[in-house]
């Protein structure tokens, strides 16, 4: 025996990715590589890519959920850039975060200035008062 304890001859455990260890879907290893190659700092800690990956995954899930709701409201089954635009611009926090972002083929929010709306006629007002 080597004196390290444990069972002799036990099979080696299969390696587990950092994404799986953190319970994430987005790739932690790729984010770590991009942080190293991007020259953001001389050294990158081991927890930084995990945290950044979790933030990216959360933001993507949040935007996709709101965009899916916008697509469903428009009776569509496929999310298009218009749905992303509506989702982001109708949410206060996302609109603040992505305020300077232009989404290609996103369009604009529907908005009609109050001065341009038709004025209520006197006949319609009189008729409603008589009832």
Swiss-Prot record:
GO terms for biological process: DNA repair; heterochromatin formation. The record marks 119 as: Not ubiquitinated. It comes from the Eukaryota. The modification N5-methylglutamine is found at residue 105. The modification N-acetylserine is found at residue 2. There is a cross-link at residue 126 (Glycyl lysine isopeptide (Lys-Gly) (interchain with G-Cter in SUMO)). Core component of nucleosome which plays a central role in DNA double strand break (DSB) repair. Nucleosomes wrap and compact DNA into chromatin, limiting DNA accessibility to the cellular machineries which require DNA as a template. Histones thereby play a central role in transcription regulation, DNA repair, DNA replication and chromosomal stability. DNA accessibility is regulated via a complex set of post-translational modifications of histones, also called histone code, and nucleosome remodeling. The [ST]-Q motif constitutes a recognition sequence for kinases from the PI3/PI4-kinase family. Belongs to the histone H2A family. This is Histone H2A.2. It comes from Eremothecium gossypii (strain ATCC 10895 / CBS 109.51 / FGSC 9923 / NRRL Y-1056).
